[in-house]
A protein has these predicted regions:
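Short, membrane-interfacial amphipathic segments enriched in basic
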Residues: 7-27
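Membrane-interface helix starts
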Residues: 21-22, 30-47, 242-248
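Secretory targeting signals
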Residues: 55-59, 93, 101-123, 162-238
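Transmembrane helix segments
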Residues: 56-57, 211-213, 243-293
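Transmembrane helix boundary and interhelical loop/hinge segments in multi-pass membrane proteins
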Residues: 129-147, 158-161
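Short helix-to-coil transition segments within interhelical loops
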Residues: 148-152
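Alpha-helical transmembrane segments of multi-pass membrane transporters/translocases
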Residues: 224-226, 294-349
Length: 349
């Protein structure tokens, strides 16, 4: 009877299971996003909007200038067709298959350039995010609060690295794709206004879907290529007592200056150009997209006709076969590991 009463009166609530490690990591990624939403989302969004606004302003100026020129004369096409105003339908009828192919390359190039602004902003956002990721929490003493929670230093640092390597570039890619299609829509309106067929002249000759898929497929390349800069900046962020920007920039820059001085003095047989390219530049600029093209010898772009090879997934993923990527990636992983170790005891101001 007593045993029965004890069992009936006892606490029969089911114990709550501990959250899974992946769920905890997702929460950390979400926290990083909401704390840095201005940089991760709004900065590339505003950059894309500004690029579209400048494009619209350029179109308006071009229309005004063209109409003033039309008021003074006529447009002659191959000394055969003479029209008043700009008739893109008549222009298209005079284009050969080779001309349309070349025009398609030019369209693809314009799509890439129209979407570059969010990627440029991404480089600066990731750079300064990593630089302050572990320093700001020590400066405002919030690191003491976060360390009181059941979250390891490993998960905290890795969530910040994951935000820089995956979350921020994924958002920038999405914004860049939206900007690209908005630019294409804007140009389609201009083509329609001048009597052309945008589906034939722009959407058909160009490859907007291929360009968009290339941006999406380049995400793992960016994550691997940016590792040395992310690792170096986070290591400086957790190590520096003050002015992490100066430490992060001046150490590799002064190292490059010393190497150049040793080279001039013939003290050591050092390749100054190699050191600046593979050590200094890789440690500071790898967070800017598409710089991996230098490793695959695709940095020499000779015109719109080469846009196809530039957007080739085979050429993009060829960087995985280069030692520059893997050496930099291992160095970045080692520095992130060092940042984890340093955060365990570095909570000073």
């Amino acid at each position: 009877m007593n045993a029965t009463s004890a069992s009936l009166g006892g606490d029969t609530r089911t114990p709550i299971a501990a959250p899974h490690a992946t769920h905890k990591f997702r929460l950390l990624l979400r926290r990083e996003f909401w704390e840095h939403k201005g940089g991760f989302f709004w900065a590339p969004f505003v950059a894309g909007a500004i690029s579209l606004l400048l494009t619209l302003m350029a179109i308006i100026v071009g229309e005004v200038v063209a109409r003033r020129a039309m008021a003074d004369g006529k447009i002659n096409i191959d000394n055969d067709v003479t029209i008043n105003g700009l008739d893109l339908g008549a222009l298209t009828s005079k284009m050969s298959a080779h001309d349309l192919e070349q025009f398609g390359h030019a369209v693809d190039l314009s799509l890439v350039t129209s979407s570059l602004w969010p990627f440029i902003v991404l480089g600066f956002v990731v750079f300064f995010y990593c630089l302050g990721a572990l320093y700001d929490e020590r400066r405002d003493r919030s690191v003491l609060f976060w360390k009181s929670l059941p979250v390891s230093d490993r998960d905290t640092v890795l969530s910040k690295a994951g935000s820089a390597l995956v979350v921020a570039p994924a958002i920038a890619i999405g914004v860049a794709v939206v900007t690209m299609f908005a630019f294409l829509t804007l140009m389609s309106i201009v083509v329609l206004f001048h009597g052309g067929n945008p589906f034939t002249l722009l959407w058909g000759s160009g490859n907007p879907l291929s360009v968009a898929m290339h941006f999406v497929a380049s995400l793992p390349v960016y994550a691997m290529w940016a590792l040395p800069t992310v690792g170096w900046l986070m290591l400086c962020s957790v190590w520096a007592r003050s002015k992490p920007f100066l430490w992060a920039v001046m150490i590799p820059v002064f190292a490059g200056i010393f190497v150049a001085w040793f080279d001039v003095m013939n003290l050591f047989n050092l390749d100054t150009a190699w050191f600046w390219q593979h050590i200094v530049a890789r440690s500071l600029t790898s967070v800017f997209p598409f710089l991996w093209l230098t490793a695959t010898h695709m940095n020499h772009f000779n015109g719109p006709e080469e846009i196809g090879s530039l957007l080739s997934l085979r050429n993009t993923y060829a960087v995985f076969a280069t030692p520059q990527l893997w050496i930099g990636a291992f160095a970045g992983i080692a520095m992130i590991f060092g940042a984890i170790k340093l955060r365990r005891w570095r909570d000073d101001n």
